[in-house]
Amino acid sequence: MFTLKIFVYTTVIFFISLFVFGFLSNDPSRNPNRKDLE
């Protein structure tokens, strides 16, 4: 059960990081290769 909780927390943090990264690099002029990351 403890391992499952760690896995869930890691997944949540991972998706939040992706959301924040996508929001900060939403400007195509700063990050023209954004399509390659999706």
Swiss-Prot record:
Coiled coil stretches, renumbered: none
One of the GO biological process terms: photosynthesis
Keyword line: Chloroplast, Membrane, Photosynthesis, Photosystem II, Plastid, Reaction center, Thylakoid, Transmembrane, Transmembrane helix
Major localisation: plastid
InterPro entries: PSII_PsbI (IPR003686), PSII_PsbI_sf (IPR037271)
Entry GO CC: chloroplast thylakoid membrane; photosystem II reaction center
Protein's cellular compartments: Plastid, Chloroplast thylakoid membrane
Its membrane topology: Single-pass membrane protein
Pfam families named in the record: PsbI
Membrane-traversing stretches: 4-24
Highest taxon, organism lineage: Eukaryota
Keyword Plastid belongs to the record: yes
Its biological purpose: One of the components of the core complex of photosystem II (PSII), required for its stability and/or assembly. PSII is a light-driven water:plastoquinone oxidoreductase that uses light energy to abstract electrons from H(2)O, generating O(2) and a proton gradient subsequently used for ATP formation. It consists of a core antenna complex that captures photons, and an electron transfer chain that converts photonic excitation into a charge separation.
Subunit structure: PSII is composed of 1 copy each of membrane proteins PsbA, PsbB, PsbC, PsbD, PsbE, PsbF, PsbH, PsbI, PsbJ, PsbK, PsbL, PsbM, PsbT, PsbX, PsbY, PsbZ, Psb30/Ycf12, at least 3 peripheral proteins of the oxygen-evolving complex and a large number of cofactors. It forms dimeric complexes.
NCBIfam families the record matches: PRK02655.1
Family statement drawn from the similarity comment of this UniProt entry: Belongs to the PsbI family.
Record's protein name: Photosystem II reaction center protein I
